[in-house]
Amino acid sequence: MAIIYLILLFTAVRGDQICIGYHANNSTEKVDTNLERNVTVTHAKDILEKTHNGKLCKLNGIPPLELGDCSIAGWLLGNPECDRLLSVPEWSYIMEKENPRDGLCYPGSFNDYEELKHLLSSVKHFEKVKILPKDRWTQHTTTGGSRACAVSGNPSFFRNMVWLTKEGSDYPVAKGSYNNTSGEQMLIIWGVHHPIDETEQRTLYQNVGTYVSVGTSTLNKRSTPEIATRPKVNGQGGRMEFSWTLLDMWDTINFESTGNLIAPEYGFKISKRGSSGIMKTEGTLENCETKCQTPLGAINTTLPFHNVHPLTIGECPKYVKSEKLVLATGLRNVPQIESRGLFGAIAGFIEGGWQGMVDGWYGYHHSNDQGSGYAADKESTQKAFDGITNKVNSVIEKMNTQFEAVGKEFGNLERRLENLNKRMEDGFLDVWTYNAELLVLMENERTLDFHDSNVKNLYDKVRMQLRDNVKELGNGCFEFYHKCDDECMNSVKNGTYDYPKYEEESKLNRNEIKGVKLSSMGVYQILAIYATVAGSLSLAIMMAGISFWMCSNGSLQCRICI
């Protein structure tokens, strides 16, 4: 009877409640932190772009220079198969095949070719300027050509160069100069012919022991032809060696030769500089536009990182080798479990989130005689939202020193340098990737701790208002010692709770409940003593009965000695 009375009493005195909690939803988004892996959160943002469209596009409305079957050398020298490239508009980047067919039609080499390609990564337009017209070489033949560069079966030559040979039986010293008054630097290319034997040397130049001299304010280069027997390429045993230089504004370049000079007819004024590059690709230009191009395809994204390809041109995210970079923006997603009550362990004592609270990250659940309901705490939610909104920008700012993997090419004699360069670039990218991943892990840890702290702060804010007018239930909830209607609940939520107004009522109810607890302790003590005595007596009677039965059937002998 006493137990029933206590149950009814405690049911009757259960007061109104208000609980502090946080948002939960059906999200399956997972993030990693320094300490945990695959933490489910309510909201997250993937900051790694993994896709491309597989197309080569215009970059910011400007098409690339599509070389087709021509190489960089074939374009600049003027291979007859590259006539469509004799005049090209501004380009955004250059598309070159891996092994273009039309390069040096007359076999030979191009000195510092890789450096020339690197120069093109900062050039967006050349203006072709005639610097040494053919008709200025009045004492030499300027119609030299070769079947290696044939057009329609007839011998021809590089369109931008002039092959000077003897006029009749004489090859006087050839001299030419050009003063760069264009207002920009100018790319100038020239060449030296290396015959197969002395007979060819005399046939073309009359002189033996010739030289080619080129000079500027910063360049002094003198070359002599190397006569040697070589295997034929494109039907030619001779070779042509091309060189280049950048002629500064107001500087002059001077040519002097007694034979074997391949003179430039045109130079290339660098009329526009900017971020460009050479895309090694077998693809063709498609009808599309982008702000970021890779050899694999265009990237159209606002994300700060990508893992598509290390070589990019345009306004591109930063390249990392990572497979996953996800930033937590929401809270740990721990939906409410009915059997465990309303809460779970986000702030150390709250056991689960509320899917019913959809208009904020943190808030309240109340219950009183007028009903129950959820309400978000707009102030703390807004502050948290403002703090996290700039998280992606913060990550970008911390990673603002982009390591740029530039596509470099190396000659056959520089393979060891190429391997070293590749290792260095791979090392830089590894470090860059590690930094990005570590930064994301740290930011995720901070975000989850930040949310945890905000819930705890909201709980403390309510606790400081209510003080001893409530009882802390230990699960994020407070039970009032006084009646708290909806107006009272709203005052708690907006921070205007009137503690003195309810102080006296709370004090009376608190003392009454304490009295019930004290009286109930006496009842429990009597019940405990009664249960102990009754249990001992029952055990003694049972033992006596067993002993009597065993004595009666002879299983137990009893001797009484006097």
UniProtKB/Swiss-Prot annotation:
Parts of the chain on the Cytoplasmic side: 547-562
Site features described as Cleavage, chain residue numbers: R340, G341
Segments in the Extracellular topological domain: 16-525
Glycosylation positions in this chain: N25, N26, N38, N179, N180, N300, N494
GO biological process: clathrin-dependent endocytosis of virus by host cell; fusion of virus membrane with host endosome membrane; fusion of virus membrane with host plasma membrane; viral budding from plasma membrane; virion attachment to host cell
SS bond partners: C19-C477, C57-C288, C70-C82, C105-C149, C292-C316, C484-C488
PTM section of the record: Palmitoylated.
Record's bilayer topology term: Single-pass type I membrane protein
Summary of subunit composition and partner proteins: Homotrimer of disulfide-linked HA1-HA2.
Additional remark text: Major glycoprotein, comprises over 80% of the envelope proteins present in virus particle. The extent of infection into host organism is determined by HA. Influenza viruses bud from the apical surface of polarized epithelial cells (e.g. bronchial epithelial cells) into lumen of lungs and are therefore usually pneumotropic. The reason is that HA is cleaved by tryptase clara which is restricted to lungs. However, HAs of H5 and H7 pantropic avian viruses subtypes can be cleaved by furin and subtilisin-type enzymes, allowing the virus to grow in other organs than lungs.
Function: Binds to sialic acid-containing receptors on the cell surface, bringing about the attachment of the virus particle to the cell. This attachment induces virion internalization of about two third of the virus particles through clathrin-dependent endocytosis and about one third through a clathrin- and caveolin-independent pathway. Plays a major role in the determination of host range restriction and virulence. Class I viral fusion protein. Binds to sialic acid-containing receptors on the cell surface, bringing about the attachment of the virus particle to the cell. This attachment induces virion internalization either through clathrin-dependent endocytosis or through clathrin- and caveolin-independent pathway. Plays a major role in the determination of host range restriction and virulence. Class I viral fusion protein. Responsible for penetration of the virus into the cell cytoplasm by mediating the fusion of the membrane of the endocytosed virus particle with the endosomal membrane.
Full protein name: Hemagglutinin
Organism: Influenza A virus (strain A/Japan/305/1957 H2N2)
Primary gene name: HA
